[in-house]
Curated annotation (Swiss-Prot):
Domain of life: Bacteria
Enzyme Commission code(s) on record: 4.2.1.17, 5.1.2.3, 1.1.1.35
CDD domains recorded: crotonase-like
UniProt name for this protein: Fatty acid oxidation complex subunit alpha
GO CC, alphabetical: cytoplasm
SUPFAM superfamilies tied to this protein: 6-phosphogluconate dehydrogenase C-terminal domain-like (SSF48179), ClpP/crotonase (SSF52096), NAD(P)-binding Rossmann-fold domains (SSF51735)
Subunit text: Heterotetramer of two alpha chains (FadJ) and two beta chains (FadI).
Similarity comment text for this entry: In the N-terminal section; belongs to the enoyl-CoA hydratase/isomerase family.
Length: 708
């Protein structure tokens, strides 16, 4: 087979042309602009060769069909017309595949996403494997785009308008069995017979177009214009509830799908190409694409230049609580590494094992996993009340109480019972790693590995180094975090590390606004509208008011008075208000409570007469600017290694609005002069804690940006 081509064709003796997709020099297939010519020449051959009875598209990569289109193509577009032209080229290529006179089959194993699914949907039949890595979806919305090569038209035709809209608006992926049930694939088979079954389909008659397998209310709604109007209205409401009007792609997707449904595919494709071109030029899509590039770049990094990580074959976890259980779960279920849990009580071990079983069982029920895979994963988890089995661990992750003496004892215990090469990773959220490693025999093997709760859902991990941490320890810990499904950033030891340090002033200022009489809902709704997933007062309830109160003095001691927490925390703690964990905080909780109403008794407790006095813009500046300022301090003090790491940490760690690119890209887009002027104005009005970080002033004087 030719190694310089991505698409190669071989016609078998039975007359089936097998087209193998194998992009040279890449681990996964992605579609590039240049491939249109390759596919075009193959189509010329197929259109003129009467001996070909059928066609099969299959991947030459072991774990993926096509992971999507190469996003770099969009950055090469200078304007909306260029991007629109790119979409039309893709549409034309897939139209030719669909219009072939013989049956065309997509044989799918692994990721079939974006442009990959658009190619597969242009085929007449789709057969996929029951492999757990097989997933079909259109994730373009996550890049601020819509599918541009026919996806907005073909998906609703195959699975129905309701299901198609949901998939395109959320980027939701379907596993093999789900795709079969939805009508997206024709058959699900074991990987070993994928090609054989695909060839069988290619030798059958070209199938007639079928209607989506709709039942019940969905069938009734999609059959009439009135019903479809309800579907489009509901889809828009649900999507905008999350998007808050911050993602232009939402409206464009709904309009484009609707165009095709009401005026036919040709009109829909025209609208799709134009909308793709327009969205590609929006600042939101630009920022979302930069995040994609940053995370892709980070996947290739070890955290320590030129140092290869050691292999991690077994992990020990100290503590079977919420964090310990979550860490054990991602180690076994995502990394595929056996985890040994140690706790002082059998209940702790039982809790940790049950935590994993519950989540795996949910996957089985949703058809994301087979029962046999659940059992195999559970066999990777074991527990003990002592250190038996820890002598074979490569990394031990500690997730016990936030107590320095206890954590130092854990270091000593692990050094005694584990191998000399074992890494000790602490999941502390506030204690300095330098102090935890202070009495260690092998301090170079002590590192921070800070997960965020809930561990199985939050994508970030902070890898915290103290001055003595070895490069080998850093590289091995970064590698483990990636296998656990995390996006790790390496940060330097210091109070609050990075994420909690930039979060603290944001929440403190929200609390001060509340004490000044600003209603809780007004503060929270304003920042949700700005783009955060939850408001700062809700976040205080979720993090724990007691936790925030405990962390504040540590930050003040290490970093100064700008971290002083409002006195309100003491009153709240005295009233036993810890937040969501004990169902008593700023909001009401409990099964009988509908929605999420404010607990208005908190106003009288804090002697507040709530009244909206600040505008949305004022609330945003008061809460957000200290976070941006603190991010600049962290860069100045080399707590983070780069603006890129700071942006990824804020987006994945606290939900900083992704469409704004992160704190540093946001400051660049606003202009440092604007940021510094606003900080100086607030410093005069609200106190010295708003004084701009020296780095911001230096950069402004020199005319620099964070991203050149």
């Amino acid at each position: 087979m030719s190694q310089d081509k991505a698409f190669t064709m071989e016609v078998r003796d039975d007359g089936v042309a097998v087209i193998t997709i194998d992009v040279p020099g890449e681990s996964m297939n992605t579609l590039k602009d240049s491939f249109a010519e390759e596919v075009g020449s193959l189509m010329n051959r197929l259109e003129s060769d009467d001996s070909v009875k059928g066609v099969v598209f299959i991947s030459g990569k072991p774990g993926s069909f096509i992971a999507g289109a190469d996003i770099n193509m969009i950055d090469g577009c200078e304007n909306a017309v260029d991007a629109e032209s790119l979409a039309r080229k893709g549409q034309a290529m897939f139209d030719r595949i669909e219009q072939l006179n013989v049956p065309v089959v997509a044989a799918i194993n692994g990721a079939c996403l974006g442009g990959g699914l658009e190619l597969a949907m242009a085929c007449h039949v789709r057969v996929c494997t029951d492999n757990s890595k097989t997933a079909l979806g259109l994730p373009e919305v996550k890049l601020g785009l819509l599918p541009g090569s026919g996806g907005t038209q073909r998906l609703p035709e195959l699975v129905g308008v309701q299901q198609g809209l949901t998939m395109i608006l959320t980027g939701k992926e379907l596993r093999a069995k789900q795709a079969l049930k939805a009508g997206l694939v024709t058959e699900v088979v074991p990987q070993s017979i994928l090609l054989d079954v695909a060839v069988e389909h290619a030798l059958k008659r070209k199938p007639k177009s079928t209607k989506p397998p709709l039942k019940g209310i969905s069938k009734v709604l999609e059959a009439t214009k009135f019903g479809r109007d309800i579907i489009f209205k509901k889809a828009s409401e649900q999507a905008q509830k999350k998007a808050q009007g911050n993602y232009p792609a939402i409206d464009k997707i709904i309009q484009t799908v609707r165009e095709g449904v009401e005026r036919g595919r040709e009109a829909g494709l025209d609208k799709e190409a134009r909308s793709f071109g327009e969205l590609a030029m929006t600042p939101e899509s630009y920022q979302l694409r930069q995040i994609f590039f940053a995370t892709t770049e980070m996947k290739k990094e070890t955290g320590a230049d030129g140092v290869k990580p050691d292999s991690v074959k077994r992990v020990g976890v100290l503590g079977g609580g919420l964090m310990g259980g979550g860490i054990a779960y991602v180690t076994a279920a995502k990394a595929g590494i056996p985890a040994r849990i140690k706790d002082i009580a059998e209940d702790g071990i039982r809790h940790a094992l049950h935590y994993s079983y519950e989540r795996l069982d949910k996957k089985v029920k949703r058809r994301h996993m087979r029962r046999a895979e659940l059992e195999k994963t559970m066999l990777m988890l074991s527990g003990s009340l002592d250190y038996s089995g820890f002598e074979r661990t490569d990394v031990v992750i500690e997730a016990v109480f936030e107590d320095l003496n206890l954590k130092q004892k854990m270091v000593a215990d692990v050094e005694e019972h584990a191998d000399e090469s074992t890494i000790f990773a602490t999941n502390t959220s506030s204690l300095p790693i330098t102090q935890i490693a202070a009495k260690a025999k092998r301090p170079e093997q002590v590192i921070g590995l800070h997960y965020f709760s809930p561990v199985d859902k939050m994508p970030l991990a902070e890898i915290i180094t103290h001055p003595g941490t070895s490069d080998k320890t850093i590289a091995t810990t970064v590698s483990l975090a990636k296998k656990q499904g995390k996006t790790p950033i390496v940060v330097k030891d210091g109070a609050g590390f990075y994420v909690n340090r930039i979060l603290a002033p944001y929440m403190n200022e929200a609390a001060r606004l509340l004490l000044a009489g600003e209603p809780i809902e007004h503060i929270d709704k304003t920042l949700v509208k700005f783009g955060f997933p939850v408001g700062p007062i809700t976040l205080l309830d979720e993090v724990g008011i007691d936790v925030a109160a405990k962390v504040a003095p540590v930050l003040v001691k290490e970093l100064g008075d700008r971290f002083e927490a409002p006195e309100a925390f003491e009153k709240l703690i005295d009233d036993d208000r810890k937040g969501k964990k004990n169902q008593k905080g700023f909001y009401q909780y409990g099964k009988s409570v509908k929605g999420k109403p404010v607990d208005t008794s908190v106003y009288s407790l804090l002697d507040i007469d709530p009244n909206e006095s600040k505008s949305a813009d004022e609330i945003i500046d008061i809460c957000l600017l200290p976070m941006l300022n603190e991010a600049a301090y962290c860069l100045q003090e080399e707590i983070i290694r780069s603006p890129r790491d700071g942006d990824i940490g804020a987006i994945f760690g606290i939900g900083f609005p992704p469409f704004l690119g992160g704190p540093f890209r946001y400051m660049d887009s606003q202009g440092l002069e604007t940021i510094v002027n606003k900080l100086e104005k607030l410093a005069a009005e609200r106190g010295e804690r708003y004084t701009p970080a020296p780095l911001l002033k230096q950069m402004l004087e020199n005319g620099w940006n964070f991203y050149q």
